[in-house]
Design a protein with these regions (language model features):
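Active-site core of glycosidic bond-cleaving carbohydrate-active enzymes
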Residues: 1-112
Length: 112
């Protein structure tokens, strides 16, 4: 059940994941334009987001020990995790998929 707070107060794990991804994209754009100083600034910001995400995943509230597929797919797709976290998230995602009979449960993936 969604409330107004779901839109007004972003989930920190989602906001951090997408911020890291956007900063990586901006770094690529600046690099392609020949603006290496700006590209490096974006890459550094993205690296900080990844470290923040890794720390967030070590907390109980945002643990990778979940059946929530989005919480496992985002960090894997965006390369946000440390090696051990990545290995755990991959195994945990397989477990989550088995638990849901291999149904994709992420809302944005089901939309047309």
């Amino acid at each position: 059940h969604m409330t107004w707070r779901d839109c007004a107060v972003p989930h920190p794990e989602v906001a951090t994941a997408y911020t890291a991804h956007v900063m990586d994209c901006m770094g690529e754009i600046e690099s392609a334009l020949g603006n290496e100083n700006e590209a490096q600034s974006y890459r550094a910001f993205a690296a900080g987001c990844r470290k923040s995400y890794q720390a967030l995943c070590r907390t109980e509230e945002y643990s990778l020990d979940t059946d929530r597929q989005a919480r496992l797919v985002h960090p894997l797709a965006f390369g946000l995790l440390e090696k051990t976290q990545t290995e755990y998230a991959q195994k945990r995602l397989l477990h989550a998929l088995e638990h849901f009979n291999w149904r994709v449960g992420m809302v944005f993936c089901r939309r047309r």
